[in-house]
Amino acid sequence: MSGLIGKKIGMTSIFDENGKNIPCTVIQAGPCVVTQVRTKEVDGYEALQLGFDDKKTVGKAAEGHAKKAGTVAKRKVVEFQGYNEDYKLGDSVTVEHFKEGEFVDIAGTSKGKGFQGVVKRHGFGGVGQATHGQHNRLRAPGSIGAASYPARVFKGMKMAGRMGGERVKIENLRVLKVVADKNLLVIKGCVPGSKNSYVIISK
């Protein structure tokens, strides 16, 4: 799957030709630099390694790797397979790789919510009613196991814990608009992650 690295700018809404208000996400997609070209002869598979967003402080290894491509070290580096075009080391891949109306998959890191209970984390309904003598069980998880057999809690039991901060991928999001001169993609709907977080757009 070919694609680009982008940065989530934020959400807005636009009107379509029928006057319907559509919520959408604006993403700065590229320009990305080809930092390495993987070949079957050398690496055993074909892929393009793209870099996005210049890095300020960088180690010698990353600096040397970027210098081969004639660029500076990048904050985000991702490999993409399935590019039909013949890109060379140091070439720039822009938002024009995408077209209006096509569907893309977007992966990112979801917003971290911290330690959350089972009602927020898993959608539990809580235990019992708010009356009839019950006073502190409204958002409790309830029973997590049986009795002396199996005498343990099964793996995968839905319980309270850290929520969010995970890799999330949303598929088949429509590209509403491509603003080539500003390297912007307008995507229908929401995209995982907070503002200014990196996302991977693939098709």
UniProtKB/Swiss-Prot annotation:
Keyword Ribonucleoprotein listed: yes
Intrachain disulfide bonds: none
Domain of life: Bacteria
GO biological process: translation
CC terms in the record's Gene Ontology section: ribonucleoprotein complex; ribosome
TM region positions: none
A GO molecular-function annotation: rRNA binding
Glycoprotein keyword on record: no
Keywords: Ribonucleoprotein, Ribosomal protein, RNA-binding, rRNA-binding
Function: One of the primary rRNA binding proteins, it binds directly near the 3'-end of the 23S rRNA, where it nucleates assembly of the 50S subunit.
Record family assignment: Belongs to the universal ribosomal protein uL3 family.
PANTHER family membership: 50S RIBOSOMAL PROTEIN L3, LARGE RIBOSOMAL SUBUNIT PROTEIN UL3C
Subunit-level organization: Part of the 50S ribosomal subunit. Forms a cluster with proteins L14 and L19.
Alphabetized HAMAP family for the sequence: Ribosomal_uL3_B
Protein name: Large ribosomal subunit protein uL3
Designated gene of the protein: rplC
